[in-house]
Amino acid sequence: TYIIYYMYLIVGCGLTGATIAERISSELNEEVLIIDKREHIGGNCYDYIDNDTGILVCKYGAHIYRSNDENVWNYINRFSEWVRWEHKVLSYVDNKFVSVPVNITTVNELCDETIQTSDEMDTWLEKTQVKYDTITNSEEMCKSRVGNVLYDKMFKNYTYKQWNKYPEELNASVLRNIPIRNNFDCRYFDHKYQALPKKGYTKFIENMLTHKNISLQLNTTYDEYMKTHNKSEFKGIIFTGPIDEYFSHSNIEKLEYRSLQFDIKRYKNMNYYQPNSVVNYPEYNVPFTRIVEYKHFLNQQSTDTIVVSETSSDIGEPYYPVPNERNLTLYKKYKNLAEYEETNNHVFFVGRLANYKYFNMDEAIANALHFFNEKIMNTVK
């Protein structure tokens, strides 16, 4: 037997890790080892066929690919066929299902209006939006966009359930991107590309990792692996996990993350449980934030259905960075340590958890491609 010497070690096999591995193996023809502490590839995009119902389920919550980035769209189409999917979301408010994002229909149903045109909607928004000299937090951001009534009904408690903080305690960026439509368009996204991978995300990521130069070792943490290895063995180490986990030996306080708890229920001989794939529950008296019914996605066929209610939590796998001043200040300290590691040990920190930044899927892939071009390709030349 001979020992393979890997040129690059990638920690984490989510979108970021898989993209960088694919690029290094195919563009540079170099050996890559990916390790992941979980028992599966795909990070939080991992999906699987549920044995009882035959329905494709995303283990860590619904993922809809949407983007205006043609470059990334062309890239992902190398590894999967994608099916156009215009995602719609309902919110259960005042004992009825209303469409999200806020559009003319939402306003008519929740505010007893009879708006018919975009001009009328613009006038209503102008009259309703709260004016601030400077916006300092998410409550002000939201009220400046939808006014007091919709803020109270749809956003205030929903945000609290998501973050365990009221909008006034969160950076304005959290609710900056809530879409508002001045028409009847009830699609959740208005991006050029909106799609789901025909055979699921796990298959898509599997197809990214087929190159002979890529090896995979699951159920392996970075700390365990490094007990028998040395940083100097590798041309580069790409770490895509939580940055504070990597520097857990430093005396900097830990960063905050939000997690999700999932409660799965199966219903035999039921066509659909709810009218839509995703229903938000913004009211305070319901503990979960939303219910996802996966059968709706790609119009899957089954005599049964499966629904997953999602509850946000401080405990569990880190999913979302919590953007407030404390965490952003701490992250800067970690970033200084990361820059030292990059310069001295060729350890690079890339991705949502490593950059302590919320990325959509297309942004995670674009970020990984940019990293490869700037930091790996440029140093090879």
Each model region followed by its residue ranges:
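Mid-domain catalytic core of redox enzymes
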Residues: 27, 220-340
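Glycine-rich FAD pyrophosphate-binding loop
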Residues: 25-51
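Conserved Rossmann-like nucleotide-cofactor binding loop
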Residues: 16, 40, 244
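Dinucleotide-binding Rossmann-like beta1-alpha1 core, especially the glycine-rich loop
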Residues: 52-128
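Active-site/ligand-binding neighborhood in enzyme catalytic cores
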Residues: 94-101, 105-236, 245
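C-terminal catalytic lobe of FAD-dependent flavoproteins
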Residues: 321-381
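Short, Lys/Arg-enriched N-terminal segments with co-localized hydrophobic residues
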Residues: 1-6
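N-terminal Rossmann-like FAD-binding beta1-loop-alpha1 element of flavoenzymes
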Residues: 8-34
